[in-house]
Amino acid sequence: IVFRAAQTRSDIEIVAINDLLDAEYMAYMLKYDSTHGRFDGTVEVKDGHLVVNGKKIRVTAEKDPANLKWNEVGVDVVAEATGIFLTDETARKHITAGAKKVVLTGPSKDDTPMFVKGANFDKYNGQDIVSNASCTTNCLAPLAKVINDNFGIIEGLMTTVHATTATQKTVDGPSHKDWRGGRGAAQNIIPSSTGAAKAVGKVLPELNGKLTGMAFRVPTPNVSVVDLTVRLEKAASYEDIKKAIKAAAEGEMKGVLGYTEDDVVSTDFNGEVCTSVFDAKAGIALNDNFVKLV
């Protein structure tokens, strides 16, 4: 998905990929995607290299990032997407190998700073290793920031109705650390834990300790929903809240936070470029200090 997204950008060039898969299989997985459809472009393998839209891409299969010799292909930024090297110590091996910057595509497991567009990206100060947090945190944080900046959040709970992920089972199977997680993904709604709400406190320190949450894994292939229920410091009607979010979506958070009043469902957001889209018709208010936002 990172690769496909990069193909839409004129300012990003993919020059190398490191994966334990062979090049032929990588080409196949890029060409065909059950959720996002066929790749819009040419994909082939020549002399062990991946060639996409006529551009040659170096392919390696190193287990140790320190051996990747990123300097040989002029790498500026590495997208560390294995889910394995999530600390400064392990991710720094990419720097040792010649890369200038590393972006972790998941939450860091140490104090490596996390940055989320629409939340705290303005605090980025040139750090060479950063985390982009999780998909759920990217959805929640921009909305939480708008609400807190305008009305103040006393406390809140988040529930994410989360699409199936690759680690789930097609049918019941052993899962020693998470018994429920071992149940068939296509057959069940599975309660699960998530650190996404607490992670918001890392990117927005003013909300630290004020939010927590949980997840339900549901049998859909893509697109997840965040349900944020909060108590507000400053009383506000639901219409006031909608206006504040719409103003942010059309202003300083344009391209990150979206806003819709259409009667949408999850598949309408397949391939959505905004990290968070507020569904104005789906939320409700109990009173002017207690609201549920979707």
UniProtKB/Swiss-Prot annotation:
<keyword id="KW-0560">Oxidoreductase</keyword>
<dbReference type="InterPro" id="IPR020831">
    <property type="entry name" value="GlycerAld/Erythrose_P_DH"/>
</dbReference>
<keyword id="KW-0324">Glycolysis</keyword>
<dbReference type="Pfam" id="PF02800">
    <property type="entry name" value="Gp_dh_C"/>
</dbReference>
<feature type="binding site">
    <location>
        <begin position="134"/>
        <end position="136"/>
    </location>
    <ligand>
        <name>D-glyceraldehyde 3-phosphate</name>
    </ligand>
</feature>
<feature type="binding site">
    <location>
        <position position="19"/>
    </location>
    <ligand>
        <name>NAD(+)</name>
    </ligand>
</feature>
<keyword id="KW-0963">Cytoplasm</keyword>
<feature type="binding site">
    <location>
        <position position="165"/>
    </location>
    <ligand>
        <name>D-glyceraldehyde 3-phosphate</name>
    </ligand>
</feature>
<feature type="binding site">
    <location>
        <position position="105"/>
    </location>
    <ligand>
        <name>NAD(+)</name>
    </ligand>
</feature>
<dbReference type="GO" id="GO:0005737">
    <property type="term" value="C:cytoplasm"/>
</dbReference>
<feature type="binding site">
    <location>
        <begin position="194"/>
        <end position="195"/>
    </location>
    <ligand>
        <name>D-glyceraldehyde 3-phosphate</name>
    </ligand>
</feature>
<comment type="pathway">
    <text>Carbohydrate degradation; glycolysis; pyruvate from D-glyceraldehyde 3-phosphate: step 1/5.</text>
</comment>
<keyword id="KW-0520">NAD</keyword>
<dbReference type="GO" id="GO:0006006">
    <property type="term" value="P:glucose metabolic process"/>
</dbReference>
<comment type="function">
    <text>Catalyzes the oxidative phosphorylation of glyceraldehyde 3-phosphate (G3P) to 1,3-bisphosphoglycerate (BPG) using the cofactor NAD. The first reaction step involves the formation of a hemiacetal intermediate between G3P and a cysteine residue, and this hemiacetal intermediate is then oxidized to a thioester, with concomitant reduction of NAD to NADH. The reduced NADH is then exchanged with the second NAD, and the thioester is attacked by a nucleophilic inorganic phosphate to produce BPG.</text>
</comment>
<dbReference type="InterPro" id="IPR020830">
    <property type="entry name" value="GlycerAld_3-P_DH_AS"/>
</dbReference>
<dbReference type="InterPro" id="IPR006424">
    <property type="entry name" value="Glyceraldehyde-3-P_DH_1"/>
</dbReference>
<dbReference type="GO" id="GO:0050661">
    <property type="term" value="F:NADP binding"/>
</dbReference>
<dbReference type="GO" id="GO:0006096">
    <property type="term" value="P:glycolytic process"/>
</dbReference>
<feature type="site" description="Activates thiol group during catalysis">
    <location>
        <position position="162"/>
    </location>
</feature>
<protein>
    <recommendedName>
        <fullName>Glyceraldehyde-3-phosphate dehydrogenase</fullName>
        <ecNumber>1.2.1.12</ecNumber>
    </recommendedName>
</protein>
<feature type="binding site">
    <location>
        <position position="63"/>
    </location>
    <ligand>
        <name>NAD(+)</name>
    </ligand>
</feature>
<dbReference type="GO" id="GO:0004365">
    <property type="term" value="F:glyceraldehyde-3-phosphate dehydrogenase (NAD+) (phosphorylating) activity"/>
</dbReference>
<dbReference type="InterPro" id="IPR020829">
    <property type="entry name" value="GlycerAld_3-P_DH_cat"/>
</dbReference>
<dbReference type="Pfam" id="PF00044">
    <property type="entry name" value="Gp_dh_N"/>
</dbReference>
<comment type="similarity">
    <text>Belongs to the glyceraldehyde-3-phosphate dehydrogenase family.</text>
</comment>
<feature type="binding site">
    <location>
        <position position="217"/>
    </location>
    <ligand>
        <name>D-glyceraldehyde 3-phosphate</name>
    </ligand>
</feature>
<dbReference type="GO" id="GO:0051287">
    <property type="term" value="F:NAD binding"/>
</dbReference>
<dbReference type="InterPro" id="IPR036291">
    <property type="entry name" value="NAD(P)-bd_dom_sf"/>
</dbReference>
<feature type="active site" description="Nucleophile">
    <location>
        <position position="135"/>
    </location>
</feature>
<dbReference type="InterPro" id="IPR020828">
    <property type="entry name" value="GlycerAld_3-P_DH_NAD(P)-bd"/>
</dbReference>
<keyword id="KW-0547">Nucleotide-binding</keyword>
<comment type="subunit">
    <text>Homotetramer.</text>
</comment>
